[in-house]
Amino acid sequence: VRFLADVVEGVEKHDGIKFNYICPFNEPDGHWNWVGPKQEGSPATNREVARTVRLLSREFVNRKMDTQIMVNESSDYRCMLRTHQTDWQRGYQIQAFFCPDSVDTYLGDTPNVPRLMLGHSYWTTTPLSELRAMRCQLREALDKYNVGFWQSETCIMGNDEEIGGGHGFDRTMKTALYVARIIHHDIVYAGAKSWQWWRAIGGDYKDGLIREYTNDDLKDGRVEDSKLMWALGNYSRFIRPGAVRLSVSAFDQAGNLIPGGDTDQKGLMCSAYQNADGSYAVVLINYAQEDKELSLIHI
């Protein structure tokens, strides 16, 4: 914890970059992430996470640092709600960290620790019924303990069979729309107040927004953007920090309310926001194979 505090203070002093947030663990519940040198998981039980966070909190308080300490960068939403491919010591994370009855792991009254959970959207994106249901369950558990949520990492994985899995860079709208649908569900159903993509630049895989083509000497090359990058920009360019999401209701041509009409997983999906400066942003996704017409009212 002294090392982390030294890093946060040192970077701000040397480079003028202030860390508003830091998370000391990445995917502590990801059993697949702990073997070999190619992944970056940091295996830990809930008790180990809680002990480390409390020690880090004490160090920050002693140094009068206001950097916020985040938990828990879960590899899978299911580990936040219950156990998934690991035991109870790494599961039920929302309850473990933010229910006062969890005396060994409760962090709700720990200085510099916001009532906020971080999780990764991997592996719960298919089938479409699971995409929605899992995020509704997550939101229900978060609301029960008055906890906020950030989606802090995801990309295309092998289970995303609708677009051929993760292999092979895709510059087309196919992957762009697929990811936009995930963003929509994470924000609208899970209530994510922040959303991050895994990687900016990569090779022949669907994890990069930009594809790099490096020359053999590794000294030069070229880059190519993707529609995915621009799809993400439809959110990040227009929805600014401090924005508030607005409810969206959909009506048919006769004026009848369409239940759940803001989310047609194979058609139109709509979310709306008001920025801190009073401006509005509306993000519309058309997953259908044909053009759609609509009218925006009361905005």
What do the predicted segments below correspond to?
Residues I22, M117, D186, L232, ...:
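Conserved, mostly hydrophobic/aromatic
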Residues V1-N20, P24, W32, Q39-R47, ...:
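N-terminal catalytic cores of secreted or lumenal carbohydrate-active enzymes
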